[in-house]
C-alpha cells in the first residue's frame, strides 16, 4: 500500500477551492476506482471554500462511484475497561460493562476527530 500526502498550506491566508483540491489529488495519482484511506487535518489547510464538504466532494469525484473512501472514525470510549490506557479501578469494571451504552453507528461520536470526519459521516452514501 502506497502512502501519499497532500500539503495545501502555503500560509494561513490561502483560499482553497474544490477544484484546487481535485487538481492536487490527481497530481498525487488518485484515479477513478481507487480505494483511499483518508485521515485529514482540515484545521491546518487554510481557508476551505465550501468547508470540509469541498474536500469530501473532491475526493468523491476523483475516485468516482467505482471507488471507495475509508475514513477512520474511532470510538475508544466503547472499549472494555480492562483494555483502556487509563483503566478505572478494577472493582468498577463489571458495573461499567453492565451500564455501558451500546455502539450506535448514527449516534456514537468519534472521539477527538477532525471536523472532516463529522462532515464525512453526514453524507448520504457513507456507511459506518
Regions found by a protein language model. Name each.
Residues 1-128:
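N-terminal and secondary-structure boundary signal
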